[in-house]
């Protein structure tokens, strides 16, 4: 009916808005690292003023709270990507998949807000930060986690499509065709992330060789 159609019409804009707000939060944390804002506890514990810019930026996800924020940013990014590039999808399937994706994001957002706030403050702020774990000061930190997360989180899109298809009662060859590009993209990102991580672990002596 008309009510259902209006709810379906809201799914795309809501997904875009969710991504926008989460991306702003991620940009704010990145800016705190780049500008060495040590009033943010996360920055004070994982960065310092003399650190090269690459490791200041990579330090954003070199800790528990920041890596969770990166995870949720990528989760919202995939939902936004479906909004932009999924115009050929049946409206009902698309809106349900976006709703499932949004609910997953809400779960992670609640976890961050309740247990892992990356914006916890330090008063008064220290003059300098503690710096990053020396083993993480490596180009691998800049590339391995983002690719790995693009792979891990990308598969949530396949899950969302699966739940949407079950709700619609249309798990068929057409559904498999619609979900294939998103699954392949996640698989490629995850493969790249594992290769980069294996290479990083191989030449980092303390980690004892290849990791899979």
Task: Name the predicted role of every residue range.
Residues 1-212:
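Polytopic transmembrane helical bundles with strong interfacial aromatic enrichment
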């Amino acid at each position: 009916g008309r009510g259902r159609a209006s709810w379906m019409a809201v799914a795309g804009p809501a997904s875009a808005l969710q991504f926008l707000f989460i991306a702003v939060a991620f940009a704010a944390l990145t800016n705190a690292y780049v500008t060495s804002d040590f009033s943010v506890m996360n920055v004070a514990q994982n960065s310092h003023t003399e650190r090269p810019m690459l490791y200041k930026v990579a330090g954003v996800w070199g800790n528990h709270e920041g890596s969770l924020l990166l995870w949720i940013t990528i989760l919202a990014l995939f939902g936004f990507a479906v909004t932009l590039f999924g115009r050929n999808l049946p409206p009902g399937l698309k809106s349900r998949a976006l709703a499932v994706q949004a609910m997953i994001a809400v779960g992670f957002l609640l976890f961050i807000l309740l247990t892992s706030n990356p914006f916890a403050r330090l008063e008064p702020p220290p003059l300098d930060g503690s710096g990053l774990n020396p083993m993480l000061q490596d180009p691998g930190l800049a590339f391995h986690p983002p690719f790995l997360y693009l792979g891990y989180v990308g598969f949530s899109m396949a899950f969302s499509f699966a739940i949407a298809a079950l709700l619609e009662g249309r798990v068929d060859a057409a559904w498999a065709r619609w979900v294939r590009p998103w699954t392949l993209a996640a698989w490629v990102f995850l493969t790249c992330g594992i290769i980069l991580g294996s290479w990083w672990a191989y030449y980092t002596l303390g980690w004892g060789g290849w990791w899979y």
